Curated annotation (Swiss-Prot):
Main location: nucleus
Pfam families: Cyclin_N, CycT2-like_C
Name under which the protein is recorded: Cyclin-K
Free-text function comment from the UniProt entry: Regulatory subunit of cyclin-dependent kinases that mediates activation of target kinases. Plays a role in transcriptional regulation via its role in regulating the phosphorylation of the C-terminal domain (CTD) of the large subunit of RNA polymerase II (POLR2A).
Modified residues (Phosphoserine): 324, 328-329, 340
The UniProt record lists the keyword Cell division: yes
GO CC annotation terms, alphabetical: cyclin K-CDK12 complex; cyclin K-CDK13 complex; cyclin/CDK positive transcription elongation factor complex; nucleoplasm; nucleus
Disulfide bonds: none
Keywords per UniProt: Cell cycle, Cell division, Cyclin, Disease variant, Host-virus interaction, Intellectual disability, Mitosis, Nucleus, Phosphoprotein, Transcription, Transcription regulation
One Gene Ontology molecular-function label: cyclin-dependent protein serine/threonine kinase activity
Length: 580
């Protein structure tokens, strides 16, 4: 793997990279010296921030009906941005919304900035949405310019999805088994976006690694492929000089993601599919206190959340930002002009009793559907009439109170895509989920069950060549051809042919060809012919021809010139006399 010489230092100016294509791959030692870690953020917290930002982009884009290529492009922008900037300087949710906004325009599936902000408002609580400040749209627009300068306007990104489908077409075997392998590998690609694998390896290598991991978990050994005689291992026809150790390292990083995030799955499941037992009628006040830390930190460490998370999220509204390594002066000036103590108090008063209760009262819908229209009246009912004790969940839908005027609307408008998503690029995607993840509750349990299964679930693939073991059709539908009869051996001698005797009164039959009879002599012309002709086949001139006359000077006479066509010769006149 090439070492990133030009991007390893965050202080590299853009003037030195005007005429060179940036390299977006780093070694692990470079990933241990990111700007966030240089400012005192521990690696575990940075990994959690990257995971939460990637899931936020994935969930917002899924609710807006964006294509998976757009979601992956936005997440790649997010990871590259924080290789030059710190999480302490730029909040992750604002950066995630900005990356999704830019990726929609690059992938030709644009969404309005206000729609992205409204969807983010429905997914985040008040503390998390406070990162957007008083003017969220202006925050995203200002950050977009910084994002473009950071990624050096290199907007085109390749993803492992297309390589995964391309490589799957080269495999041989049962189509159902290969489709199951592709579905599992596709899910691993979705989850790998929450890691830094896209900053370490090319998409071709990641596609091979997830196929390798899916084959191991499915107990499906790839034994036949198109270029098997040329390559010893199946992935060498796609990527060369990649040892097994590299694939094993990528697989371990993906599996470590599930072991690290299993305690934090409630943080991501509200964005996807929440389990019904956690949404049973419970007292609202204690549930609100537990829902806020579940979005940002682990439940087992509530003491670490208080000194870090609120201070970091309220930092943009309380004190000016530190200068960042990249040009961030417009963002710093904007913060100093817009924020004021009065607006802080106004923005902090009404929201707290509303948004967290919405998340604990109503089950989130699947990502492909927007929230129902009855969500804003319920949010208003919970916000205005806050009960001091337990509230029965069956009475909540009957409350009809008009929603108050709120600067940040709670509900999300139905998605209005500018164009339908492109058709699936391969037949393996028929009936396949493109937004699946093993980071949810059910997905993690199914992954654990597959990892604990012992013994191959599929038998060995049949050989691709050789005679079939059974008839391809039923015998009385297409009977097989009978074997040909044996050819008799030739006789040792042939008897003479029987010639019938000649019949009297009829002319004798024409003579037949006899190989022992000599051929007749050639017929010559008669000798009385004048002049006598030479024998056929001889081209020599006869002896009676006189020799050509040669003048004394040794030069044969020159024949007269041939008259031009259409001009008859005139006797007795030369050419000069005739022209007179």
């Amino acid at each position: 793997m090439k070492e990133n010489k030009e991007n390893s230092s965050p202080s590299v100016t853009s003037a030195n990279l005007d005429h060179t294509k940036p390299c977006w791959y780093w070694d692990k030692k470079d990933l241990a010296h990111t700007p966030s870690q240089l400012e005192g953020l521990d690696p575990a917290t940075e990994a959690r921030y990257r995971r939460e930002g990637a899931r936020f982009i994935f969930d917002v884009g899924t609710r807006l009906g964006l294509h998976y290529d757009t979601l992956a492009t936005g997440i790649i922008y997010f990871h590259r941005f924080y290789m030059f900037h710190s999480f302490k300087q730029f909040p992750r949710y604002v950066t995630g919304a900005c990356c999704l906004f830019l990726a929609g325009k690059v992938e030709e599936t644009p969404k309005k900035c206000k729609d992205i902000i409204k969807t983010a408002r429905s997914l985040l609580n008040d503390v998390q949405f406070g990162q957007f400040g008083d003017d969220p749209k202006e925050e995203v627009m200002v950050l977009e310019r910084i994002l473009l300068q950071t990624i050096k306007f290199d907007l085109q990104v390749e993803h492992p999805y297309q390589f995964l489908l391309k490589y799957a077409k080269q495999l041989k075997g049962d189509k159902n088994k290969i489709q199951k392998l592709v579905q599992m590998a596709w899910t691993f690609v979705n989850d790998s976006l929450c890691t830094t694998l896209s900053l370490q390896w090319e998409p071709e290598i990641i596609a091979v690694a997830v196929m390798y991991l899916a084959g191991r978990l499915c107990k499906f050994e790839i034994q036949e492929w198109t270029s098997k005689p040329m390559y010893r291992r199946w992935w060498e026809q796609f990527v060369q000089d990649v040892p097994v150790d590299v694939l094993e390292d990528i697989c371990h990083q993906i599996l470590d993601l599930y072991s690290q995030g299993k305690q934090q799955m409630p943080h991501h499941t509200p964005h996807q599919l929440q389990q019904p037992p956690s949404l049973q009628p419970t007292p609202q006040v204690p549930q609100v206190q537990q829902s806020q830390p579940s979005q940002s930190s682990e439940p087992s460490q509530p003491q670490q959340k208080d000194p870090q998370q609120p201070a970091q999220q309220q930092q943009p509204a309380q004190q000016p930002k530190k200068p960042s390594p990249q040009p961030s002066s417009p963002r710093q000036v904007k913060r100093a002009v817009v924020v004021s103590p009065k607006e802080e108090n106004k923005a902090a008063e009404p929201p707290p009793p509303k948004i967290p209760k919405i998340e604990t009262t109503h089950p989130p819908l699947p990502p492909a559907h927007p929230p129902p229209d009855r969500k804003p009246p319920l949010a208003a009912a919970l916000g205005e009439a806050e009960p001091p004790g337990p509230v029965d969940a069956t009475d909540l839908p009957k409350v009809q109170i008009p929603p108050p005027a709120h600067p940040a609307p709670v509900h999300q408008p139905p998605p209005l895509p500018h164009r339908p998503p492109p058709p699936p690029p391969s037949s393996y995607m028929t009936g396949m989920s493109t937004t699946s993840s093993y980071m949810s509750g059910e997905g993690y349990q199914s992954l654990q069950s597959m990892m604990k299964t012992e013994g191959p679930s599929y038998g060995a693939l049949p050989p691709a060549y050789g005679p079939p073991a059974h008839l391809p059709y039923h015998p009385h539908v297409y009977p097989p051809n009978p074997p040909p009869p044996p050819v008799p051996p030739p006789p040792a001698s042939f008897p003479p042919p029987a010639i019938p005797p000649p019949t009297p009164g009829y002319p004798p039959p024409p003579p037949t060809y006899n190989p022992n009879f000599p051929p007749p002599p050639p017929r010559l012309p008669p000798t009385h012919a004048v002049p006598p002709h030479p024998p056929p086949g001889l081209g020599l001139p006869p002896a009676s021809y006189p020799p050509p006359a040669v003048p004394p000077g040794g030069q044969p006479p020159v024949p007269p010139p041939i008259p031009p066509p259409g001009m008859p010769p005139v006797g007795g006149l030369g050419r000069a006399a005739w022209m007179r």
